[in-house]
Amino acid sequence: MISHEHPISIYWNDCSKSEQKKLLTRPINNKLNDIYINVKNILTKVYNEGDRALFKFNFDFDNVQTTQLQIPTEIIMNSGRNLSNEIKQAIHTAMTNITRFHQAQCYSEIIVETLPGVYCQQIIRPLNIVGLYVPGGTAPLLSTVMMLGVPARIAKCKRVILCSPPPIPDVIIYTAQLCGIDEIYQIGGSQSIAAMGFGTESIPKVDKIFGPGNIWVTEAKRQINLAPNGAAIDMLAGPSEILIIADNTANPIFIAADLLSQSEHGPDSHAILITPYSCIAEKTKKELHKQLKILPRNDIVRNVLLNSRMIITNNLMECFSISNSYAPEHLIIQIENASDYLHYITNAGSIFLGNWSPETAGDYASGPNHVLPTYGRAVATSGLGVIDFQKRMSVQQLTQNGLLQLSSTITTLTQIEQLKAHEYAITHRINYIKEQNEHSLLG
């Protein structure tokens, strides 16, 4: 049972360096080795047995007897029949905002003449076949369909498939259809990642796999990414996390609501409040317990709060420094004139400024993607975007004059690196040009 002392308020500057480091350390799953072995066995079975293994896993894991994996076109076309206008309008509004934001991300192709006669281009091409994974659970995660399907459509991927555990709710199928996805397969978990990574009789092998999932799905993505005949992946997502920076103008009701909203994602979620004001921490703590009573999933949230932190600092600058070290998936800055402090933030998956920007808005409908780096990976990686569904290719074209101008530079560098064949690739051409010029003069 969680006491009213939790989460415990901790004064940052009263802690040693090792204690400070421990405060920002994410929970570690002690069952990783067992999961690794079990996932490896699932992947091997799918690789060897294809669809037959998938049908068996559907029965074993989801207690569903399937005779076909692909959702028929007729079901896709009729998926919105039993959905209310209110639901359809909410999906439409969210998709409009997500589309608007992601369309603005599109990169322009470039061409640069680095020297006279040396033309360099960068061109963009969509990925050919991509696989989207949408987790199952107690409620349909249609927001994930939009966050994956919209950028895939904008990127103009040639073929997009979607996998989700059976039975797939109509609202998931309907949302996928709106995203232009007409290949939907009823298979979930590690086995769906294996199917997309290796390919089976029914499910095509994809170039890249996208989407969040539990620790089994994440481990499957990791193994598929490392397999020589596997597929690329978007990222390895860990448990969800939120960090809130608050000053004395912040509303404890809002802070508590945001901490709780993130905590209900699962028992491994991480929630941290950092503030220079102990009174804000205490008021938030009281509000947490008040709001906790009305939540239907409060057992999960209670466990998360046991491992949550309320860190008291000397000033706001210290808050920013701690946040950058932690590199949260979601960062909420509930301080006065929050946008004035944005330049102090260097590491975060997604940032929410001010009292009126709850993390929930980003989860569903404001526009940016909610597939974000976790476990501190925001120090080097970004949230999902259109570019993740595309690839950049460089193009170079040199004229004779361009090669002549660049040849001495190239040959000098090849000689330093002692790569003689590289040097000859230049000198043979230069000699040919000189011979042609001599013949022209003689002719």
Swiss-Prot record:
Task: Name the residues that bind NAD(+).
Answer: Y133, Q191, N214
Q: In which pathway does it act?
A: Amino-acid biosynthesis; L-histidine biosynthesis; L-histidine from 5-phospho-alpha-D-ribose 1-diphosphate: step 9/9
Q: What class of enzyme is it?
A: oxidoreductase
Q: Where does Zn(2+) bind?
A: Q262, H265, D363, H422
Intrachain S-S bonds: none
Task: Name the chemical reaction catalysed here.
Answer: L-histidinol + 2 NAD(+) + H2O = L-histidine + 2 NADH + 3 H(+)
Can the keyword Metal-binding be found in this entry's annotation? yes
Classification via Pfam families? Histidinol_dh
- The catalytic site is made up of E329, H330
Q: In the record, what terms sit under GO molecular function?
A: histidinol dehydrogenase activity; NAD binding; zinc ion binding
User: What detail does the entry give on cofactor binding?
Assistant: Binds 1 zinc ion per subunit.
Under Gene3D superfamilies, the record lists: 1.20.5.1300, Nitrogenase molybdenum iron protein domain
* Residues bound to substrate: S240, Q262, H265, H330, D363, E417, H422
Cofactor(s) essential for the protein = Zn(2+)
Cellular component aspect of the GO annotation: cytosol
GO biological process terms, semicolon-separated = L-histidine biosynthetic process
Write down the EC number: 1.1.1.23
Q: Where is the signal peptide?
A: none
Checking HAMAP family in the record gives: HisD (MF_01024)
State what this protein does.
Catalyzes the sequential NAD-dependent oxidations of L-histidinol to L-histidinaldehyde and then to L-histidine.
- Subunit record text: Homodimer.
Which family, according to the similarity comment? Belongs to the histidinol dehydrogenase family.
This chain belongs to the protein called Histidinol dehydrogenase
Organism, scientific name: Blochmanniella pennsylvanica (strain BPEN)
